[in-house]
From Swiss-Prot:
Gene: cysI
Protein name: Sulfite reductase [NADPH] hemoprotein beta-component
Phylogenetic classification of the source organism: Bacteria, Pseudomonadati, Pseudomonadota, Gammaproteobacteria, Alteromonadales
UniProt catalytic activity: hydrogen sulfide + 3 NADP(+) + 3 H2O = sulfite + 3 NADPH + 4 H(+)
Organism, as annotated: Shewanella sp. (strain ANA-3)
Highest taxon in the source lineage: Bacteria
Residues given in the record as siroheme binding sites: C478
Family matches, as HAMAP family: CysI
Length: 565
């Protein structure tokens, strides 16, 4: 049998001189606001994507103008923690160098800028560098931003888990100096040993993106089972002793292609804290060597485990780590939401969690969110923690400073909004007009959609029940819709696939209930189901579990076999 041809991206990576390509030349060109096709793939490793305003695409085409190109830049902020000083720098960049004039908190605990003209990219990256921030490996076929539960109650355990997340992020960064040379004007160093440039990744990096999270039970706001690699903290007497390791999660799929599917990670066993780096590197290098490099739609770790088998994969990871898994420890995985309002930590400091709808921090009529965050940053003595639910925690507030912080938050609309249980558990991706993959609206439409859900819950007397609702403009799954009790995935403008049946804790996927339907049909279906749920539910039964128990949808047990079936 002839050898299969590699995916185009593999050749691009091989020939890129460790992610340099012709990015520098493209950056210097004023002929177009775009990069070349090849460099558009390489710039992802540097932390940004090329986009254009799709609302204006046809108009500009009629005017014989190229699309209004801009860039989305995503920062690397392991664990989502930054200082007030850093935030002021982040805010200044958003206000002066982007057309969106906003900061977008992401579902992976970092922030994005939208609407960056090519000419401003270098200035922005240098501005982030001055604040000890960067965007390297925030995108691309590498380990992405490492998530970690903010967990403001168990501060000591959070601090230990956060240190692990930071070490994972730093240890698994690409070693190439391309980022420093192109964006920070550092000199290129001569090298003769190809593979020593990237001791973990090698010349072709990973077959596909790689996502990692550290969870601190009982919280699961990081949706640990949706990640390629997860570490679930195990504590004894309040001290971190190790982790249950999970591997093989991932949300992305392609409409109509049954060989692609979302998947939740498998449990592999317990590892000691001192062995975390060994196992992380072992899992990544197995994926590097075994992952599919011919078909990018089947290149994630989840498919590697499915194709090679759990036991074979586990044995290879143990062999490379030089350590065997112990039986997994018992831990309780619970709520995926954030604790809104004030929460006192074990150290006597207070933490204020702010609900940021769809993560968009921007001044709009009636809500000066960006100004409010800026004013808080000017006086705050603790830190800021971005959550994977697109929210913000003002962390480490002394008791005597609470009133001032709360006053600013209320003045600028960061506090005081009516927040239902379901809205507090809802997230959406950006989608239109900037995301090139979006087939339907998400962020711009989602607040209105949640208004409808809230009204239906109130009508049926179930407003006290939190339901995890998520919406994306395409099946790539950035807002993790396939792990939502109600998931909406864009199929075409104004049309979505409706998924039901994931559980509240995030340990079971949902399943398609209705395909390619519009708002009126979606709401009619949910109204009928809410009416049944109100009278037929068992005590304490969540909506997702109800839809499975009553046969509305079948439980997804093995995604490779039954997600589409």
């Amino acid at each position: 049998m002839s050898e299969q041809k590699l995916a185009l991206n593999e050749y691009l990576k091989t020939d890129s001189d460790y992610l340099r390509g012709t990015i520098k030349e493209g950056l210097d060109s004023s002929v177009t606001g775009s990069f070349s096709d090849g460099d558009q793939q390489l710039i992802k490793f540097h932390g940004f994507y090329q986009q254009d305003d799709r609302d204006l695409r046809n108009e500009r085409k009629e005017q014989k103008l190229e699309p209004l190109y801009s860039f989305m830049l995503r920062a690397r902020v392991p664990g989502g923690v930054c200082t007030p000083k850093q935030w002021l720098g982040v805010d200044e960049i958003a206000s002066t160098l982007t057309s969106s004039n906003s900061i977008r908190l992401t579902t992976r605990q970092t922030f994005q800028y939208h609407g960056i003209p090519k000419r401003n990219l270098k200035t922005i990256i240098q501005g982030l560098d001055r604040e000890a921030l960067d965007s390297i490996a925030a995108c691309g076929d590498v380990n992405r931003n490492v998530m970690c539960n903010p967990n403001p109650v168990e501060s000591k355990l959070h601090a230990q888990a956060y240190e692990v997340a930071k070490k994972l992020s730093d240890h698994l960064l690409p070693h190439t100096r391309a980022y420093a040379e192109i964006w920070l004007d550092e000199e290129k160093l001569l090298t003769t040993e190809d593979e020593t440039v990237e001791p973990v990744y090698g010349k072709t990096y990973l077959p596909r993106k790689f996502k990692m999270a550290v969870a601190v039970p009982p919280d699961n706001d990081v949706d640990v089972y949706t990640n390629d690699l997860g570490f679930i903290a195990v504590a004894e007497n309040g001290e971190l002793v190790g982790f249950n390791l999970t591997a093989g999660g991932g949300m992305g799929s392609t409409h109509g292609e049954v060989e692609t599917f979302p998947r939740l990670a498998d449990d592999f066993g317990f590892i000691k804290t001192e062995d975390v780096m060994k196992f992380a590197e072992a899992v990544m290098t197995v994926q590097r060597d075994w992952g599919n490099r011919t078909n990018r739609k089947r290149s994630r770790l989840k498919y590697t485990i499915v194709d090679h088998g759990y036991e074979k994969f586990k044995a290879e990871v143990e062999a490379r780590a030089g350590v065997k898994f112990e039986p997994k420890r018992d831990v309780v995985i619970g709520d995926r939401g954030d604790r809104y309002g004030w929460v006192e930590g074990v150290d006597g400091k207070w933490h204020l969690t702010l609900f940021i709808e769809s993560g968009r921090i921007k001044d709009v009529p009636g809500k000066s969110l960006q100004t409010g965050m800026r004013e808080i940053a000017k006086i705050h003595k603790g830190d800021f923690r971005m959550t994977s639910n697109q929210n913000m925690i003002i962390a480490g507030v002394a008791p005597e400073d609470k009133a001032t912080i709360e006053g600013l938050a209320r003045k600028h609309g960061l506090l005081g909004q009516v927040l239902t249980q379901t809205r507090g558990h809802s997230i959406a991706c950006v989608a239109l007009p900037t995301c090139p993959l979006a087939m339907a609206e998400a962020e711009r439409y989602f607040p209105e959609f949640i208004d409808h859900i809230d009204a239906l819950q109130a009508k049926n007397g179930i407003s006290d029940q939190a339901i995890v609702v998520r919406m994306t403009g395409c099946p790539n799954g950035c807002a993790r819709p396939f792990a939502a009790e109600i998931g909406l995935v864009g199929k075409a403008p104004g049309r979505y696939n409706l998924y039901l049946g994931a559980n509240f804790e995030g340990t079971r996927l949902n399943k398609m209930y209705r395909e390619n339907i519009q708002e009126a049909e979606i709401l009619a279906e949910l109204d009928a189901l809410f009416a049944r749920y109100a009278v037929e539910r068992n005590a304490g039964e969540t909506f997702g579990n109800f839809t499975v128990r009553t046969g509305v949808v079948k439980a997804v047990i093995d995604a490779a076999k039954d997600f589409h079936g």
